[in-house]
């Protein structure tokens, strides 16, 4: 069926710079009227808006005015550019055609509205499954090329009104030939300078099977290993990026009814990543991230005693280097209960106690001057 479905495109710029092309396939066999509206607005030859007669019925030149991470990217207000305008080719509004198709995956194209039967030109691209929109918004297409660009738009910083900080503009749009096919390598993940060819979102990566725990773990481990290699080469900034990416990949994985052995593997990998993030952050003097990552490791499920000691040691050092000797002593003393003979922990505890003692002496001296 996809061979006969029409395909349209947006050429996108972000912050005034060309960002790439998004290609849509329209479900004209399921919702022909809704698909035709979108196609004609991409084509741009259907006349002018009734509310603003000098503005063509076209997406060209309009913007993505509302973007909410892990939800959707909204566009299509070519009259007001803020979500209050836009028109369909049938008039200001047209009815909901049907709700046959569900919001069951990312990269679907669906109509935005202000209630029942108020479809115009505004649409959104889903970033995740959004089942709460079923029966309320009409799904009429999907992104078949440019998914990575959609993720870039999704991850763009936004203001309080969810408007992208860097303008996301539809520089051009149109209808593709009926025989257009997506190039075989169009959605392939490019390999970066460090050998990483995995997507930020595991569900977007054709190399990863979300239904296979080993496929997911292998992907996370592969990115983690790149981080470790960069850490050994003292490229701490890159190492942190890769460890953070690995951690985020794992956070996206929500398996059901896994064997206990697999659950333990996932938990162990999660803790290992938190510890690595804490360590590389410590090395690069990013102490706030050390504190948060070590705390995440301590609060994670199934953290063993050795890992708890590492987390407390690294968090204790972060407190020490940020002049919080009291908290450093607290963490390092607790670390010794898990690893009582670890010389690095013992040495750090001695330093922290000395710093705490010096701080108390300094405070006493300051107080004595106040009352002398």
From Swiss-Prot:
Residues 9-175 form the PPIase cyclophilin-type domain. Its EC number is 5.2.1.8. GO terms for cellular component: cytoplasm; intracellular membrane-bounded organelle. TPR repeats lie at residues 220-253, 271-304, 309-342. GO terms for biological process: protein folding. It catalyses: [protein]-peptidylproline (omega=180) = [protein]-peptidylproline (omega=0). One of its GO terms (molecular function) is peptidyl-prolyl cis-trans isomerase activity. It comes from the Eukaryota. It is found in: Cytoplasm. SMART domains: TPR. Pfam families: Pro_isomerase (PF00160). The keyword Cytoplasm applies. PROSITE patterns: CSA_PPIASE_1, CSA_PPIASE_2, TPR, TPR_REGION. Keywords: Cytoplasm, Isomerase, Repeat, Rotamase, TPR repeat. InterPro entries: Cyclophilin-like_dom_sf, Cyclophilin-type_PPIase_CS, Cyclophilin-type_PPIase_dom, TPR-like_helical_dom_sf, TPR_rpt. PPIases accelerate the folding of proteins. It catalyzes the cis-trans isomerization of proline imidic peptide bonds in oligopeptides. Belongs to the cyclophilin-type PPIase family. PPIase D subfamily. PANTHER family: PEPTIDYL-PROLYL CIS-TRANS ISOMERASE, PEPTIDYL-PROLYL CIS-TRANS ISOMERASE D-RELATED. This is Peptidyl-prolyl cis-trans isomerase D.
């Amino acid at each position: 069926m996809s061979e006969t479905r029409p395909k349209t495109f947006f050429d996108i710029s972000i912050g005034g710079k060309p960002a790439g092309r998004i290609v849509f396939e329209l479900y004209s066999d399921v919702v022909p009227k809704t698909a035709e509206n979108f196609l004609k607005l991409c084509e741009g030859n259907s006349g002018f808006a009734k509310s603003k007669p000098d503005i063509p019925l076209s997406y060209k030149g309009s913007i993505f005015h509302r973007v909410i991470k892990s939800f959707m990217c909204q566009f299509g207000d070519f009259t007001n550019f803020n979500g209050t305008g836009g028109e369909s080719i049938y008039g200001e509004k047209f009815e909901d055609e049907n709700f046959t198709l569900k919001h069951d995956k990312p990269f679907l194209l669906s109509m935005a509205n202000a209630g029942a039967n108020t479809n115009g030109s505004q649409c959104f691209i889903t970033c995740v499954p959004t089942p709460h929109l079923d029966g309320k918004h009409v799904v009429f297409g999907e992104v078949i090329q440019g998914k990575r660009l959609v993720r870039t738009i999704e991850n763009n910083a936004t203001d309080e009104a969810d408007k992208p900080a860097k303008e996301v503009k539809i520089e051009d749009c149109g209808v593709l030939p009926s025989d257009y096919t997506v190039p075989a390598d169009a959605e392939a993940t490019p390999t970066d300078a460090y050998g990483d060819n995995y997507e930020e979102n595991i569900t977007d990566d054709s190399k990863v099977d979300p239904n296979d725990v080993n496929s997911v773990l292998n992907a996370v481990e592969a990115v983690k290993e790149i981080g470790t290699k960069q850490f050994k080469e003292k490229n701490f900034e890159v190492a942190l990026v890769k460890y953070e990416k690995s951690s985020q990949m794992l956070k996206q994985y929500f398996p059901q009814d896994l064997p206990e052995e697999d659950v333990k593997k996932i938990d162990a990998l999660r803790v290992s990543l938190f510890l690595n993030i804490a360590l590389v952050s410590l090395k690069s003097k990013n102490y706030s991230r050390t504190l948060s990552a070590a705390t995440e490791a301590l609060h994670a499920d199934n953290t063993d005693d050795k890992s708890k000691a590492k987390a407390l040691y690294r968090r204790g050092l972060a407190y020490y280097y940020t002049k919080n000797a009291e908290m450093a002593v607290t963490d390092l003393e607790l670390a010794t209960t898990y690893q009582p003979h670890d010389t690095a922990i013992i040495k750090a505890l001695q330093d922290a106690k000395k710093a705490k003692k010096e701080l108390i002496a300094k405070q006493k001296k300051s107080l004595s001057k106040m009352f002398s």
